[in-house]
């Protein structure tokens, strides 16, 4: 069991957190592990795991690692993963695990087989259903024998209308995608890069999907921009964990960049590029995606240091607009699904079982922000500043509120402090 704990610590813990948090973890455990202060950065994940196994023989230091991850908002999902792995080793959730193996993977199949066992085989049930439908259709046709031709025509028309209804139903479901990909407003987002027609954008998007490797981070309708664009970095957050569509825990960070005429919010899914996203640094990006005004950079994108001749001068008005926050009264008027970024003052905090309600307020009004997952009960209090990244507007019973999504991030600035050092590297 001890070896299992060490495996979790090393493979599911230390190897999955970035260098910054690993350095922070080593600093906090320096005394327990007798780490030399001058050589802390030289210790590898394997060496730390070996030391933890010796220092904490009961669980190889897994408990310490979980406590650390729980205290760091960006690593709370990692803490949940580690606790689940630990419970599986101790056998606390063996029944739950067996239920999950039989359930979530094939819920529809299981249900259909249960029904089939009560009523006969699934295929037979389907045949009975189609027979009943055919009988109903025959009865309807027989109500007016003299108008058989008209009835047939109406039947064909009805079938066409049903097909159209199915297509419309599918089309209505198509926009269901991560909240951060919804339509933004001009008040809090930069304009779209190209003003080409939607038809040409769809054609370009279709070509890009064929030529580019599949990437689940790319939202539907995103447009690939292969030509280089030189920008100046304004801000960048620390990397944080998020859950991908494949239910894998990955890392990303948010940034804001600007050209000579506009600014953009950026989602960066390759944290190896973090060093390039430093304040006032000039970079040239290419092979990036644009979706509703938000730029997305992944592993296939190119980010290079800009040459001296490529340096640009960003007007002060662009920088001011990029750093400005939308008024809450304007947020309340927004359309459901609209994405918002901004810094707001926390007025009230109410912790619930599944989520936390953060009421933010400015001179124009107040609005509720709902935080769940790793943004549930974050370390903040009234008067603190909450810097919200990629929160989308939702309406419940006519009341607007901001809700977190897969790519949402919250940066807390304590009351009395001008700015946290990790906001901009």
UniProtKB/Swiss-Prot annotation:
InterPro entries: DAPIN, DEATH-like_dom_sf, HIN-200, HIN200/IF120x, NA-bd_OB-fold. GO terms for cellular component: nuclear periphery; nuclear speck; nucleus. Residues 129-177 are annotated as: 4 X 7 AA tandem repeats of T-S-T-A-Q-A-[GR]. It comes from the Eukaryota. Sequence repeats lie at residues 129-135, 136-142, 143-149, 150-156. Induction: By lipopolysaccharides (LPS). Its main location: nucleus. GO terms for biological process: activation of innate immune response; cellular response to interferon-beta. Keywords: Nucleus, Repeat, Transcription, Transcription regulation. It is found in: Nucleus. It holds the Pfam family PYRIN. SMART domains: PYRIN (SM01289). Residues 1-88 form the Pyrin domain. Residues 86-99, 159-176 have a biased composition (Basic and acidic residues). Residues 86-223 are annotated as: Disordered. Residues 213-413 form the HIN-200 domain. Residues 207-218 have a biased composition (Polar residues). The keyword Transcription regulation applies. Mononuclear phagocytes. Gene3D superfamilies: Death Domain, Fas (1.10.533.10), Nucleic acid-binding proteins (2.40.50.140). Inhibits cell growth via p53/TP53 and RB1-dependent and independent pathways. May work in synergy with TP53 to promote the transcription of CDKN1A/P21. Belongs to the HIN-200 family. Interacts with HOXB2. This is Interferon-activable protein 211.
């Amino acid at each position: 069991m001890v070896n299992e704990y060490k495996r979790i610590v090393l493979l599911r813990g230390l190897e999955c957190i970035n260098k910054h948090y690993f350095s922070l973890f080593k600093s906090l455990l320096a005394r327990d592990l007798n780490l030399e202060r001058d050589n802390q950065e030289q210790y590898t994940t394997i060496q730390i795991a070996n030391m933890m196994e010796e220092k904490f023989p009961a669980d190889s230091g897994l408990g310490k690692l979980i406590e650390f991850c729980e205290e760091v908002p960006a690593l709370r999902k990692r803490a949940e993963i580690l606790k689940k792995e630990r419970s599986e080793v101790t056998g606390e959730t063996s029944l739950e695990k067996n239920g999950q193996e039989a359930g979530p993977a094939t819920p529809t199949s299981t249900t259909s087989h249960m029904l089939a066992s009560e009523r006969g085989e699934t295929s037979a049930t389907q045949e009975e259903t189609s027979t009943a439908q055919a009988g109903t259709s025959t009865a309807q046709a027989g109500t007016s024998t003299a108008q058989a031709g008209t009835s047939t025509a109406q039947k064909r028309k009805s079938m066409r209308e049903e097909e159209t209804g199915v297509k419309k139903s599918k089309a209505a479901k198509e926009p269901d995608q991560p909240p951060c990909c919804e339509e933004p407003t001009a008040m809090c987002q930069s304009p779209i890069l190209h003003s080409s027609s939607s038809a040409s954008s769809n054609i370009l998007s279709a070509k890009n999907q064929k030529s580019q490797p599949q990437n689940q981070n790319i939202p539907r309708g995103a447009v690939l921009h292969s030509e280089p664009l030189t920008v100046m970095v304004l801000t960048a957050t620390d990397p944080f964990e998020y859950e991908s569509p494949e239910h894998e825990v990955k890392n990303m960070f948010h940034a804001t960049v600007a050209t000579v005429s506009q600014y953009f919010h950026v989602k960066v899914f390759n944290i190896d590029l973090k060093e390039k996203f430093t304040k006032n640094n000039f970079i040239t990006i290419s092979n990036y995606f644009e979706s509703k005004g938000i730029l997305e950079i992944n592993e296939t994108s190119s980010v290079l240091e800009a040459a001296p001749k490529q340096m640009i001068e960003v007007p002060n008005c662009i920088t001011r607009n990029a750093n400005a926050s939308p008024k809450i009264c304007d947020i309340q008027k927004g359309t459901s699904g609209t994405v918002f970024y901004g810094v707001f003052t926390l007025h009230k905090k109410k912790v619930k079982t599944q989520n936390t309600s953060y009421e933010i307020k400015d001179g124009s009004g107040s609005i509720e922000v709902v935080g769940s997952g790793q943004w549930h009960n974050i370390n903040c209090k009234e008067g603190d500043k909450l810097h919200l990244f990629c929160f989308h507007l939702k309406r419940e019973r006519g009341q607007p509120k901001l809700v977190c999504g897969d790519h949402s991030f919250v940066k807390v600035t304590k009351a009395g402090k001008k700015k946290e050092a990790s906001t901009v590297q």
